[in-house]
Amino acid sequence: LLSAQLADFQGGELLVDLYCGAGTIGLTMAHRVGQLVGVEIVPDAVENAKANAKRCGIENARFLCADAKQAAVQLAQEGLRPDVVVVDPPRKGCDPQVLEAIAKMSPQKLVYISCNSATLARDCKQAAGAAGLPPKNSGSGGPLPENHPCRMCCTAAA
């Protein structure tokens, strides 16, 4: 995955995957990090993420069934300090409070995946200002079946 390549993991990182769905993106990175925390609001998707982790023999992942905004704010208040945060929000982009919570968590890297270039640009700009994470790399991937024509990925790093 392009997102894993752009994240440039060194090994042992704490990765938070917001809007994780069935865990596909985070689980592809789990073998490169120390711990994965996935957050998704859809209960069936969270159960699928847990099943996918088990099926793949991944033991360093946990998944929370929660709204991304509420979870991000709570994780920031708890003092969680992830090395990398991955977001793959809906087309409307991230809620501003999600980006503020990410800034409070002070990650070294933010990997933003989107099918909407306008919200990707808007949110990466806000992340750059709030968290001091200027965009470093970007790329795009091929089409997904019966989905948008391409996925874009932007990495912001301190």
Residue spans of the language-model regions?
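Rossmann-like S-adenosyl-L-methionine
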Residues: 1-158
